[in-house]
């Protein structure tokens, strides 16, 4: 079982289409737990507030207070992430996208455990090459596998907040599906 834990900063349609060329079968499970607009707004506001607070250290804030002039040095990464959260809030408010928690899992089976492990390594390598962070589950393997079953919404829940456009870009729309 390979689980995607980290996501790239940008997405495009057919983002994970490279998996189709690996030459073996796998089961792709996408579980998206959508948030209503109020809950998504609350979560995004919390993210924005946390990132905005990280722009300046406590020492910088104290120095600004004592000297009564703003410091030119800010954490630009935190500033950019606060701006991203603000842009996400604006997209949510305009109704362009929705937000939710996404869990992507790829299950591989083979009668030979060594072949299954090699297939898992190939899948992990292909996913990581696209800017994701994928892990071959070991300790959490049973929970991850249970989370791939329909109706099991509580096993292997991941917490990254993604919007619906990213979800559409990660959907296996280019794959052949026999059933």
PLM regions and their residue ranges:
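Extended, folded cores of ATP/NTP-driven motor/assembly subunits in large transport
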Residues: 1-175
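Glycine-rich phosphate-binding loop of nucleotide-binding enzymes
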Residues: 179
